[in-house]
Swiss-Prot record:
Name of protein: Protein smoothened
Tissue specificity of this protein: In embryo, found in the early neural folds and neural tube, pre-somitic mesoderm and somites, developing limb bud, gut, eye, testes, cartilage, muscle, lung, epiglottis, thymus, tongue, jaw, taste buds, teeth, and skin. In adult, found in multiple tissues including heart, brain, liver, lung, skeletal muscle, kidney and testis.
Subcellular localization, as worded in the UniProt entry: Cell membrane; Cell projection, Cilium
Organism: Rattus norvegicus (Rat)
Basic residues bias: start-end ranges: 674-684
Family: Belongs to the G-protein coupled receptor Fz/Smo family.
Annotated spans, Required for interaction with PRKACA: 574-657
Location of the region described as Interaction with BBS5 and BBS7 in the Swiss-Prot/TrEMBL record: 542-573
Region of interest (Disordered), residue spans: 35-61, 674-702
Residues linked to a glycan: 38, 192, 497
Length: 793
C-alpha cells in the first residue's frame, strides 16, 4: 500500500482475513507466523498470543468515516506534549499545518500561538484546535481531520485574531479542512483552561469589563498610558490646587455670611452662589484623598477601570463624585451668565430709582439649578460616566469623547458667548456713564466706576482665557485619542505575544507605548478649572472685606468697634419718623442707631454706585437737629393720624388759645402775584400788643364731600407765619392757620411779643426767628414714608 494513497477503513479487515485463509490452506507455518507477527506485533507467536489473552478488553475506537480522514505520511511523535497536555497517541503528521514542514517547526508555531494564553476565554477553546491541526493523530498512514464544530467554537472568543492578523487559510473553518460531524481524539484531551491576562490587562469574568475583543481580560484600574510617577505627580498637583480653590471659595462664602444683611443684594449676592458651586466642586475633587477612596471611586470590584457607569453591580461612589463635580461645574457657569446679565441691567439703571432685578431673582434660581440637573440626568441615562485614575474622579466622556464634547464643551461655549456679550455691554454702559455724564458723578462714584471697569476687564480676560485653555486641551485630547488607543492596543498585543501569521524565529522585542498623552496638557486643563474658581473668589479681596471681618471679630469678642460709622441721611430721617411717638412725648430725646442702621459696603465693593448722593458723610449738627427738622416739616404730629382715614373722624373739642397769629395776603400783592406769578414772598409783621382777638371763622363752610378729611388739630403755642400787612396796621380777622409743633421754642415774657411786659416786638420771617441758622431745605422723605414706621433700622 503506497503512502499517500487513500485507504478506506472498511476494506482493510476483509483483505487481511483473505491473506490468513490462503496461508492456512497452503500449510505454511513459518510464513503464517511471520505474517502474524507483522500484524500483531513483534515477538514469538505464543508470547504474542499470551499477551493478547492477558490484556484488558477495551472497546475499539469508532470507525473513521471516509470524509473525516486523509491519507498522510505518519511520523513518530518527537514531542509527546501539546500546549502542556499529554497526547494519547504516538504518531502524527504535519500535513494539516500549512505553515510547518516539520514537527520542530510546528512546535515553534505552537509556542507563538501560546500568546493567546493571555486571552483566557480564547485560550480555553483554541487549544484543542491547535493540537488537532499542528499535532494530529496519524495512524496507518491516515490522519484525523478536526470537526467543523471545534473550529467554529473559536471564532467568538478569539475575535482578536481575526481583527488583528486574520486567521491563516488552514485555520479557516472551510469544509475541506473541517468537515461536519467528525469525532477527534484531541477532543478527549483535558487542557489547562486557566489562562492569564498579561499587564496592563487583568482577569475578569464581567463581560462589561472586557477589553474589546480580549474576552476574559479588562484594562487595569490604573491608567496604563501614564506611569506610576506621573500618577503621583498629578495627585499632588490636584491636592494643592484643589485645596487652594476650596479655601478661597470658603473664605468668600464666610465673608458673605458674616455680613449677610448688607451682602444679600443683587447682583453682588450672585457671586456667593458662584463661589458656593466651585467650593462644592473642589470638595468632589478632594474626596479622593480619603483613605482608600480613590480606588473605590475609579475602580471596579474586579480591579478594572470603571466606564459606562452607572451599573447595577457596582457601588455609587463613582456616580456620587460625578454628580458633585459636574453639577457644581455646570451650575457655576450658568450662574456666571446670570451674573453678567445682572451687571448689564444694573449698570443701565444707574442714577434712577428703577430696580431692574426686582421680581427676577426666582427665575434666576430656577434656571441655574434646573438646567444642570437636566444635563446630569441625561448623562446618567445614557451611562457615559467613566473613571480616571490620573484625575481620581469620575466624569463624562473619558472613554467616548463625543459625549464630553456635547455635555461639557457645548455648554461652556454657549456660556462664553452669552456671558461675554453681557459683560462687554456692561463695561460699555459704565464707560458711557463716565464719559457722557461727568457732572452727575461725584468723585467717589467716578472712582468706583473706574475701579469696577478695571476689575471687570481683568475678570473678563481671565474668564475668556480659562475657557479658551479648556477648549484647547479638550481638542488636543479629541484629535489624538485615536492614536493613543492604537498605541495602547499594540502594546497589549505585544505583551500578549499575539504574533499570528508571522513565520519568524526572531525574539520578541520589548513592548512600550509609543504615543501617550502629555501630562503637562492635563495639568494646564486642571489649572484652568481651578483658576476659574479662584478668580471668582477675588471679588471679595477688598478693603471692605477687612472691615467686615473686623466688625465680626468685635461682635464675637464683645469689644467696641472704634471705626467711624457712616449713616445715610435718608435712613436718619426715616428713623426719626418711626420714633415719632417717643419724640412727641420727649422732644429732647436723641436718636440711637444700631449697627444695622450703619451704612457700609458689602464684601463686593465697587458695585454700589451712589450717583445721587455726593457724600455720605453727615455732620454732627445735622444729626442733632434731624428731629426738629422732621417736626418742622410736619412729619411729627401731636397724635397718630392716618394718612388715608377710612371715615371722617370726629374733630376734637376746640379750646381757646391765646397764642395765635393772623395771616392774610394784601389785595395789592395778590394782584401782582396773579399778573406775574414770579414773586412769591410775603411780608410779615408781628401783631401789636394787646388782648388776643376772638376767633371768627368768616370763611364759608365747605360743602359735604365724600373725601375723608383730617381732624381738626388742637391749637398749641407755635409761630408758623406772620401777617403780610404793613407796620402799625391793625390785624385782620379770618383765615387762621393752626399747626401743632411741639419743637418750637417756648418764648420767655421778656422775649415774646404777645405777652404783656415785652420790651420790644420780635421780628419773624417765614416761620422762624431771624438770625437763626437755616434748616436744610431739600430732604427726601420718600424713603421714610415707604419704610415701616416701627422697624429697627
Amino acid at each position: 500500500m503506497a503512502a499517500g494513497r487513500p485507504v478506506r477503513g472498511p476494506e482493510l479487515a476483509p483483505r487481511r482475513l483473505l491473506q490468513l485463509l490462503l496461508l492456512v490452506l497452503l500449510g505454511g507455518r513459518g510464513r503464517g507466523a511471520a505474517l502474524s507477527g507483522n500484524v500483531t506485533g513483534p515477538g514469538p507467536r505464543s508470547a504474542g498470543g499470551s499477551a493478547r489473552r492477558n490484556a484488558p478488553v477495551t472497546s475499539p475506537p469508532p470507525p473513521l468515516l471516509s470524509h473525516c480522514g486523509r491519507a498522510a505520511h505518519c511520523e513518530p511523535l518527537r514531542y509527546n506534549v501539546c500546549l502542556g497536555s499529554a497526547l494519547p497517541y504516538g504518531a502524527t503528521t504535519t500535513l494539516l499545518a500549512g505553515d510547518s514542514d516539520s514537527q520542530e517547526e510546528a512546535h515553534s508555531k505552537l509556542v507563538l500561538w501560546s500568546g493567546l494564553r493571555n486571552a483566557p476565554r480564547c485560550w480555553a477553546v483554541i487549544q484543542p484546535l491547535l493540537c488537532a491541526v499542528y499535532m494530529p493523530k496519524c495512524e496507518n498512514d491516515r490522519v484525523e481531520l478536526p470537526s467543523r464544530t471545534l473550529c467554529q467554537a473559536t471564532r467568538g472568543p478569539c475575535a482578536i485574531v481575526e481583527r488583528e492578523r486574520g486567521w491563516p487559510d488552514f485555520l479557516r473553518c472551510t469544509p475541506d479542512h473541517f468537515p461536519e460531524g467528525c469525532p477527534n481524539e484531541v477532543q478527549n484531551i483535558k487542557f489547562n483552561s486557566s489562562g492569564q491576562c498579561e499587564a496592563p490587562l487583568v482577569r475578569t469574568d464581567n463581560p462589561k469589563s472586557w477589553y474589546e475583543d480580549v474576552e476574559g481580560c479588562g484594562i487595569q484600574c490604573q491608567n496604563p498610558l501614564f506611569t506610576e510617577a506621573e500618577h503621583q505627580d498629578m495627585h499632588s498637583y490636584i491636592a494643592a490646587f484643589g485645596a487652594v480653590t476650596g479655601l478661597c471659595t470658603l473664605f468668600t462664602l464666610a465673608t458673605f455670611v458674616a455680613d449677610w444683611r448688607n451682602s444679600n443684594r443683587y447682583p453682588a449676592v450672585i457671586l456667593f452662589y458662584v463661589n458656593a458651586c466651585f467650593f462644592v466642586g473642589s470638595i468632589g475633587w478632594l474626596a479622593q484623598f480619603m483613605d482608600g477612596a480613590r480606588r473605590e471611586i475609579v475602580c471596579r470590584a474586579d480591579g478594572t477601570m470603571r466606564f459606562g457607569e452607572p451599573t447595577s453591580s457596582e457601588t455609587l461612589s463613582c456616580v456620587i463624585i460625578f454628580v458633585i463635580v459636574y453639577y457644581a461645574l455646570m451650575a457655576g457657569v450658568v450662574w456666571f451668565v446670570v451674573l453678567t446679565y445682572a451687571w448689564h441691567t444694573s449698570f443701565k439703571a444707574l442714577g434712577t430709582t428703577y430696580q431692574p432685578l426686582s421680581g427676577k431673582t426666582s427665575y434666576f434660581h430656577l434656571l441655574t439649578w434646573s438646567l444642570p440637573f437636566v444635563l446630569t440626568v441625561a448623562i446618567l441615562a445614557v451611562a457615559q460616566v467613566d473613571g480616571d485614575s490620573v484625575s481620581g474622579i469620575c466624569f463624562v466622556g473619558y472613554k467616548n469623547y463625543r459625549y464630553r464634547a456635547g455635555f461639557v464643551l457645548a455648554p461652556i461655549g454657549l456660556v462664553l458667548i452669552v456671558g461675554g456679550y453681557f459683560l462687554i455691554r456692561g463695561v460699555m454702559t459704565l464707560f458711557s456713564i463716565k464719559s457722557n455724564h461727568p457732572g452727575l458723578l461725584s468723585e467717589k462714584a467716578a472712582s468706583k466706576i473706574n475701579e469696577t471697569m478695571l476689575r471687570l476687564g481683568i475678570f473678563g480676560f481671565l474668564a475668556f482665557g480659562f475657557v479658551l485653555i479648556t477648549f484647547s486641551c479638550h481638542f488636543y485630547d479629541f484629535f489624538n485619542q485615536a492614536e493613543w488607543e492604537r498605541s495602547f492596543r499594540d502594546y497589549v498585543l505585544c505583551q500578549a505575544n499575539v504574533t499570528i501569521g508571522l513565520p519568524t524565529k526572531k525574539p520578541i522585542p520589548d513592548c512600550e507605548i509609543k504615543n501617550r498623552p502629555s501630562l503637562l496638557v492635563e495639568k494646564i486643563n486642571l489649572f484652568a478649572m481651578f483658576g476659574t474658581g479662584i478668580a471668582m473668589s477675588t471679588w471679595v479681596w477688598t478693603k471692605a472685606t477687612l472691615l467686615i471681618w473686623r466688625r465680626t471679630w468685635c461682635r464675637l469678642t464683645g469689644h467696641s468697634d472704634d471705626e467711624p460709622k457712616r449713616i445715610k441721611k435718608s435712613k436718619m430721617i426715616a428713623k426719626a419718623f418711626s420714633k415719632r411717638r417717643e419724640l412727641l412725648q420727649n422732644p429732647g430725646q436723641e436718636l440711637s442707631f444700631s449697627m444695622h442702621t450703619v451704612s457700609h459696603d458689602g464684601p463686593v465693593a465697587g458695585l454700589a454706585f451712589e450717583l445721587n448722593e455726593p457724600s455720605a458723610d453727615v455732620s454732627s449738627a445735622w444729626a442733632q437737629h434731624v428731629t426738629k427738622m422732621v417736626a418742622r416739616r410736619g412729619a411729627i404730629l401731636p397724635q397718630d393720624v392716618s394718612v388715608t382715614p377710612v371715615a371722617t373722624p370726629v374733630p376734637p373739642e376746640e379750646q381757646a388759645n391765646l397764642w395765635l397769629v393772623e395771616a392774610e395776603i394784601s389785595p395789592e400783592l395778590e394782584k401782582r402775584l396773579g399778573r406775574k406769578k414770579k414773586r412769591r414772598k410775603r411780608k410779615k409783621e408781628v401783631c401789636p400788643l394787646g388782648p388776643a382777638p376772638e376767633l371768627h371763622h368768616s370763611a364759608p363752610v365747605p360743602a359735604t364731600s365724600a373725601v375723608p378729611r383730617l381732624p381738626q388739630l388742637p391749637r398749641q403755642k407755635c409761630l408758623v407765619a406772620a401777617n403780610a400787612w404793613g407796620t402799625g396796621e391793625p390785624c385782620r380777622q379770618g383765615a387762621w392757620t393752626v399747626v401743632s409743633n411741639p419743637f418750637c421754642p417756648e418764648p420767655s415774657p421778656h422775649q415774646d411779643p404777645f405777652l404783656p411786659g415785652a420790651s420790644a416786638p420780635r421780628v419773624w420771617a417765614q416761620g422762624r426767628l431771624q438770625g437763626l441758622g437755616s434748616i436744610h431745605s431739600r430732604t427726601n422723605l420718600m424713603e421714610a414714608e415707604l419704610l415701616d414706621a416701627d422697624s429697627d433700622f
